[in-house]
């Protein structure tokens, strides 16, 4: 399932002509799968892992978590996290069970669209 989610996210980015890296983590934030698209920047791999870790830790898309920094700016100091759009949780009965992180597109919003495509692939 993790590989299917990662490939779906990478495929969505490819269709949009974006070179990204994708990571899928489990409930405990352990990396299950990483895929790096041709031409993805060297920073994108680590960023994708951190976005997925952040999304599963808070059970929320990382775009929503960015807004929390206004009231709790020290959240960004938690090791392993990255508060930029591009991470999307996978839930079962409302609880986080995994997350998909994507990095490398020109905007975090694009990254997150691709991450959500990965999550959606799990429902197929």
What function would you assign to each model-found segment?
Residues 1-124:
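Flexible, solvent-exposed loop/hinge segments and secondary-structure transition points
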């Amino acid at each position: 399932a993790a590989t299917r989610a990662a490939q779906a996210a990478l495929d969505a980015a490819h269709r949009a002509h974006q070179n990204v890296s994708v990571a899928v983590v489990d409930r405990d934030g352990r990396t299950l799968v990483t895929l790096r698209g041709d031409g993805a920047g060297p920073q994108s791999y680590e960023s994708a892992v951190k976005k997925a870790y952040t999304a599963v830790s808070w059970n929320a898309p990382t775009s929503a978590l960015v807004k929390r920094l206004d009231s709790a700016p020290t959240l960004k100091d938690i090791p392993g996290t990255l508060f930029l759009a591009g991470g999307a949780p996978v839930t079962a009965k409302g609880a986080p069970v995994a997350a998909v992180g994507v990095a490398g597109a020109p905007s975090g919003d694009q990254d997150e669209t691709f991450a959500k495509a990965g999550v959606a692939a799990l429902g197929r």
